[in-house]
């Protein structure tokens, strides 16, 4: 960041743009200025997203390894019409974490669903990896699954489904609270 601030304050000779070194200096100053503008805009938007998530789903942020970006993606996935998601399995299918049978002969296996909202699936993956790094229960769960003969990726697929179930329950309870407040007022 210090280098970027130095580049922004630099004063290249704008009349010597035909020289390669000066053209580089001019471009670097322009890129550094644009970087700082975008950095400031991202910071402002992160603050807005955090405020929105805190208002709409404070319980979601309290979950392990769920940050504001992942929580906001969950809210975007559910949308303004949560009634369309009748069960946690429909939510899992929407997120692309419902199991798809991929059996062959004697092997009974499931693979990850490649459909659904890929951004929601990515957010679930970030949460799963965060929990795998920091949560002892999650580490034990994955170790147990690997001990049962599953690969680590299959164990993570199961973990993503579990997290999806947990988040669906939180969001459904949130919607019930919002609806009960609207009915009473």
Question: What are these language model-derived features?
Answer:
Residues 1-185:
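A detector of single, family-specific signature residues
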């Amino acid at each position: 960041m210090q280098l970027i601030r130095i580049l922004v304050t630099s004063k290249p000779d704008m009349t010597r743009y035909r020289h390669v070194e000066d053209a580089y200096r001019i471009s670097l100053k322009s890129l550094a200025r644009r970087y700082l503008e975008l950095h400031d805009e991202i910071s402002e938007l992160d603050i807005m997203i955090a405020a929105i998530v805190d208002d709409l789903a404070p319980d979601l942020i309290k979950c392990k390894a769920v940050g504001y970006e992942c929580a906001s993606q969950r809210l975007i996935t559910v949308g303004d019409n949560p009634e369309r998601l009748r069960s946690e399995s429909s939510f899992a299918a929407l997120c692309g974490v419902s199991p798809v049978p991929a059996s062959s002969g004697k092997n009974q296996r499931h693979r990850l669903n490649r459909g659904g909202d890929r951004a929601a699936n990515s957010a679930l993956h970030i949460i799963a990896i965060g929990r795998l790094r920091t949560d002892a229960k999650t580490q034990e769960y994955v170790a147990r699954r690997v001990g049962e003969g599953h690969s680590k990726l299959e164990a993570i697929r199961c973990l993503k489904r579990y997290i999806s179930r947990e988040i669906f329950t939180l969001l459904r309870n949130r919607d019930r609270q919002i609806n009960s407040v609207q009915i009473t007022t």
